[in-house]
Amino acid sequence: LWSCYTSRLSDEESADYLCKTCAPSPGLDVFFPAGGDPGDLRADEFFKRCEKVKEELQKQFPNVKLWPSAQAPHEYPDWGECFKREMAKLPEEIDGVIYGPNHPFTLDEMRRSIDPKYEIRYYPDVCHNVRCEIPVHFDRDDWHYAYAATLSREAINPRPSEYRLVHRLTRQYVCGSVSYSEGVNDDVKKFIYSDLDFDPNCDIRETLRDYARCFLPGFDPEKIADIIFGLEQNWIGDPAENSSVDNVYNLLLSLKNDAVLENWRFVLLLFRASCDKVVRDRRIFELGLIDDAATKIRKGEIEAAREILAEEYPQSYKELRGSLFPLAERLNRLIGMQLDVEHFGGMNVERGCTLDTIDIPVTDRQYLFKKLNEHPDREYLTDILDRNKVERDEFYFSFAEHGFEVIGRQNGEFYMNFVGDDNTDGSMPMCMTKVYDHFNFDCKVAGLTGGDYELRITYKSRPNDKIIHHKITFNGDVLYDGPQFGGRRDGDYEKKYLVGGYQSIVYDVPSRFFVNGCADIEITEPIDGFMFSEFRLTKKR
């Protein structure tokens, strides 16, 4: 039994509530209270609550075991350390511990810190795609912004190979997992993870064949396995460059008939494949428009550029986009799936309401169109087009456009905050749609042979007067160490290139900070961390 605690109830009231809730049950084996997500008790209070609840539950269920989850409320930075101190007391009431989302420490740190008499059970997040414990491509966090914006946090998400990797990375620390779900969007992953728990060496392709035999009878199990693996492949790289999207969609169309459209699992796969193709086709079309419009802008033909950017989608795209609602209607009838708020009663657009997010911008078409209408000026618009261009001996990096392959994997458990699904009006350029949130950042840059430079960072505003050591070093030498951000703020740049809630901060970097044109740049802040979406090193002019 999973449950959460709140400070609104006393220990006695909480125990009474849970005992009454469990009273009709013929048995209760394990009680699994979450420390946070949700929950708002301090760690020591959480342990006292756990002990009281177990004491009362044992009156009805003498053999019930207590497995508290080390999920930390965000308001207590020291919650994790306090949890470890409580566990160091070797409490007899506790039989094991759970490791789940919103954890205050890594799984390795948890296992090292807690006596081996307490087994750890994993509570993996199989549901979510972004802003979560295991984001798409969690080992590199490079899910393309076009998908992250349009499919969002709870889209249909079979990721068999990736969750096999999750299982391999965690299984040596844990005694198993607690399979859970918040819907049917993660239907395939539940079977994959449960099968891996049963046999860590199982062939996941055979798991998918079994899935097909059980739930999609009459189809070639190999084809269904190929489709599911293909949906995972669809999410690799830029959708405009990924032909897997077309292949998977066409394969599903070849299997489609009236009878199979009554099978919700088939419709689930078809809906996801159709969404992927909508994103790919729209992105290809719009990138072509942007290229054509850019040519006109550079020639000063502003009105011609406007007409190009306003061009309608082709009929084939309109028909494809129009096919989504009938599929969503069918899924709602068959399984109660809620793919939008208005028609199907979804809680909010982030909770799997793909129909509400599928039309969010996937290119800078709308952004450029807005800029063109606001400033129909050749020079201004050329600057917008060249926003991210730098010289050969300069450097520009965007988390959204470039990913960690360019700068290397970061230390610790950073948080990648995707903000593109808020960009419904196209006011934000795509290069700003991913915001890195952590206490440290490190990257190596070379080829900086132009003398003195300027470092320009686009920070997300999060004012904190307590910060006194926002620190930037180049090759180990301190460039800045002081209150939050430091440097000098460039309001003109912000007005022209950024959106509200972001700051452009510039730091002077004299040539002595470079070693033969190379720089090992490190940013640290130990209290609240920092958030930024992009940076550039340009020659001082």
Model-predicted regions and their roles:
Residues W2-F219, P314-E329, R333:
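Catalytic-core regions of glycoside hydrolase
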Residues S3-K20, A34, P38-K48, N102-E109, ...:
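Generic structural signal for short, solvent-exposed loop/turn connectors between secondary structure elements
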Residues F46, E81, R111-R112, E133-H137, ...:
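Surface-exposed beta-strand edges and their flanking turn/coil or helix-capping segments
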Residues A146-L151, N157-R159, D203, E241, ...:
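Poly-acidic low-complexity segments
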Residues L169-V174, D203, K223, V435, ...:
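Generic detector of ordered secondary-structure context
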Residues S181-K189, N201-N388:
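C-terminal non-catalytic alpha-helical accessory regions
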Residues L368-R541:
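Extracytoplasmic
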